[in-house]
């Protein structure tokens, strides 16, 4: 018969110390916490937690070993109007569990009750927490520590990136192990990628709505257990756990000089709205973990049914501990925060919010690359440029300006230039560096680059919402034909814009982020919200990749790394050697001239040597070059037997880079 001694309120979670397991659980409003232990046959033993220190319930299991399955039942008031939804009929997952065994199906037993507690027991349906204790030999692994000025981010999904790669063994495709495969690493190295940003690898579940339609949450933003590695991306090889496989991947990428950033989800939980499943925080301490309205309803500022109350002292520490766990146990180099405005809500957004202060005070985490998606859907949710020093931010204004300039003719060159210069008006006055602007043309959320040039309308019928989901504001241009089938003239214009947008992205000041597959010409058939498409729609088709475009992209990244104005991470100042803005005649643009003449033509001289020529019009143009001898460089020309140029004739929707001869 298992007996719990008092144990200790620290460390948090379930920890094996060599002689037993110490269990802790936070709940400020519970009346009783019961530890539930499960054997291999699923038989449950319930033991009341014997001690409480402050709001931490704790107990120690002598003789407990790694592999122990467990969960919790928490008793207390069921008073929804006051935010309390305790229900001991529901087995609950430890918010700090580092592994889970099983899956969460669409099961009515997870219902906690809306106005009255649901009395159906959920233990048989709920995955069990696992106590793990895994040593790992990092073999001297060190972070690549890529300076921000040299950083080129590649946003990718573990499965989407590797599932169809022909040079990766079939049994490893779509897994963490595939990330460590030499063929994948060679692609990243050849391309010039410095930093791999992975969509969520935290343990996530599929929403009941998707399960009913036979779909899944492919992107993985419906996180249940943020400390746990998602086993769906593990190869399942004998003796190799998901955690070890991910560690192996990070180590291999580090050995190749590539950083790893994880996309993490702390804005909401997988419990969704009041009608969603009771799996974890709702039953542990609903009033502490979630933002609630005065009448106890969920304040749905995320659009996902709930929002985590990250300003609560314990919840703040929960996030900090989780980030440190990933940093320490998996050696990751940084984090991208989904719907990052929630991090700073108190409930209004505050640069000095408790979580921001805790991140800044943590020497290990503050040294990581921290990236925010600077919005949520709540009041005051759009916060681009307002995050504290130490954060970089996804820049949707850059995205829309570059799309509008090249594809719609709607953006004047002054606006283009402002965003080409790392959106200085957003970041410089707030004491941030250019690298704070994470420049992107596309991301996982939206059209791929190719689809941006082939579709004026979204085509999301496969998502099962009658094409209502996904953005209608895409700033795209199909050049007169909806879809991938078009005549040669249309494809010529599309490919010109494809290269122009890639060039703009990779030669802008700030931190470029390339969506995996854009360098290959990947299409999602016009689906701009493929979050639930775990199939060939989202998996990169390596067999049909545009090899010439891949070479073009690699040449661009190499070119970027040669230009000091782009790598030194300092703001460009008027009159300095970093940048000169010129008109089509090669003359410096005065303040008045910015608003005159053709608004889709421009020359940009970088570091007094590299000349970027831009013709975003729909017709050919001729530009007079500034004084000096100019020649083409890869990927825009061949340096051998180079022609010395004094003028440049550019086709429609064209960008070119020349270098000044010494």
Swiss-Prot record:
It catalyses: Hydrolysis of (1->6)-alpha-D-glucosidic linkages to branches with degrees of polymerization of three or four glucose residues in limit dextrin. It holds the Pfam family GlgX_C. The keyword Protein transport does not apply. The keyword Membrane does not apply. Pathway: Glycan degradation; glycogen degradation. Its EC number is 3.2.1.196. It is an enzyme of class 3 (hydrolase). One of its GO terms (molecular function) is hydrolase activity, hydrolyzing O-glycosyl compounds. SMART domains: Aamy. GO terms for biological process: glycogen catabolic process. Gene3D superfamilies: Glycosidases (3.20.20.80), Golgi alpha-mannosidase II (2.60.40.1180), Immunoglobulins (2.60.40.10). The record marks 445 as: Transition state stabilizer. Keywords: Carbohydrate metabolism, Glycogen metabolism, Glycosidase, Hydrolase. The active site is at residues 338, 373. It comes from the Bacteria. PANTHER family: GLYCOGEN DEBRANCHING ENZYME. Belongs to the glycosyl hydrolase 13 family. Removes maltotriose and maltotetraose chains that are attached by 1,6-alpha-linkage to the limit dextrin main chain, generating a debranched limit dextrin. This is Glycogen debranching enzyme.
């Amino acid at each position: 018969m298992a007996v719990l001694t008092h144990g200790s309120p620290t460390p948090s979670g379930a920890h094996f110390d060599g002689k037993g397991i110490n269990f802790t659980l936070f709940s400020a409003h519970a009346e009783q916490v019961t530890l539930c232990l499960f054997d291999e046959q699923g038989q449950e033993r319930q033991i009341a937690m014997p001690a409480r220190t402050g709001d931490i319930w704790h107990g120690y299991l002598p003789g407990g070993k790694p592999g122990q399955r467990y969960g919790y039942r928490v008793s207390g008031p069921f008073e929804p109007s006051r935010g309390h939804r305790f229900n001991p009929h529901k087995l609950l997952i430890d918010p700090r569990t580092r592994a889970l065994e099983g899956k969460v199906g669409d099961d009515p037993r997870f219902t906690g009750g809306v106005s009255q507690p649901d009395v159906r027991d959920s233990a048989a349906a709920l995955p069990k927490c696992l106590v793990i204790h895994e040593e790992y030999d990092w073999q001297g692994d060190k972070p690549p520590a890529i300076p921000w000025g040299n950083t080129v981010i590649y946003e990718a999904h573990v499965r989407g990136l590797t599932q169809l790669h022909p040079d990766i063994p079939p049994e490893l495709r779509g897994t963490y192990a595939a990330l460590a495969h030499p063929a994948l690493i060679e692609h990243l190295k050849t391309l010039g990628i410095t930093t791999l940003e992975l969509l969520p690898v935290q343990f996530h579940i599929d929403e009941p709505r998707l399960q009913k339609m036979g779909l899944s949450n492919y992107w993985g933003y419906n996180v249940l257990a943020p400390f746990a590695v998602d086993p769906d991306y593990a190869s399942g090889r004998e003796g190799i756990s998901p955690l070890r496989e991910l560690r192996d991947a990070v180590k291999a990428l580090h050995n190749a000089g590539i950083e790893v950033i994880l996309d993490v989800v702390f804005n909401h939980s997988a419990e969704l709205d009041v009608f969603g499943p009771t799996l974890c925080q709702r039953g542990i301490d609903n009033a502490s973990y979630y933002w609630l309205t005065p009448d106890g309803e969920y304040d749905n500022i995320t659009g996902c049914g709930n929002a985590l109350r990250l300003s609560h002292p314990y919840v703040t520490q929960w996030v900090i501990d989780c980030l440190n766990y990933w940093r320490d146990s998996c050696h990751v180099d940084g984090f991208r925060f989904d719907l990052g405005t929630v991090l700073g809500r108190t409930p209004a957004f505050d640069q000095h919010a408790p979580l921001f202060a805790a991140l800044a005070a943590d020497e290990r985490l503050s040294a990581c690359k921290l990236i925010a998606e600077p919005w949520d859907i709540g009041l005051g949710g759009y916060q681009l440029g307002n995050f504290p020093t130490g954060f970089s931010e996804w820049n949707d204004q850059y995205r829309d300006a570059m799309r509008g300039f090249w594809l719609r003719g709607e953006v004047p060159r002054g606006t283009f230039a402002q965003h080409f210069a790392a959106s200085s008006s957003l970041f410089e006055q707030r004491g941030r560096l250019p690298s704070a602007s994470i420049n992107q043309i596309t991301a996982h959320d939206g059209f791929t680059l190719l689809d941006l040039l082939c579709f004026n309308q979204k085509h999301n019928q496969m998502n099962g919402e009658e094409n209502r989901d996904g953005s209608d504001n895409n700033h795209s241009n199909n050049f007169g034909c909806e879809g991938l089938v078009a005549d040669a003239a249309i494809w010529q214009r599309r490919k010109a814009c494809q290269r122009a947008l890639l060039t703009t992205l990779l030669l802008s000041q700030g931190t470029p982020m390339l969506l995996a597959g854009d360098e290959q010409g990947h299409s999602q058939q016009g689906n701009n919200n493929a979050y639930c498409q775990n199939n060939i729609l989202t998996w990169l088709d390596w067999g049909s990749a545009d090899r010439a475009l891949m070479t073009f992209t690699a040449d661009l990244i190499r070119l970027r790394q040669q230009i000091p104005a782009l790598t030194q991470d300092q703001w460009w100042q008027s009159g300095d050697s970093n940048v000169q803005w010129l008109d089509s005649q090669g003359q410096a643009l005065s303040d008045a001239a910015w608003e005159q003449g053709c608004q889709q033509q421009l020359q940009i001289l970088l570091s007094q040597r590299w000349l970027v020529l831009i013709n975003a019009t729909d017709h050919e143009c001729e530009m007079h070059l500034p004084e000096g001898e100019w020649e083409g460089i890869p990927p825009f020309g061949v340096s051998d037997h180079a022609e010395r140029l004094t003028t440049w004739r550019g086709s429609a929707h064209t960008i070119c880079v020349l270098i000044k001869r010494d």
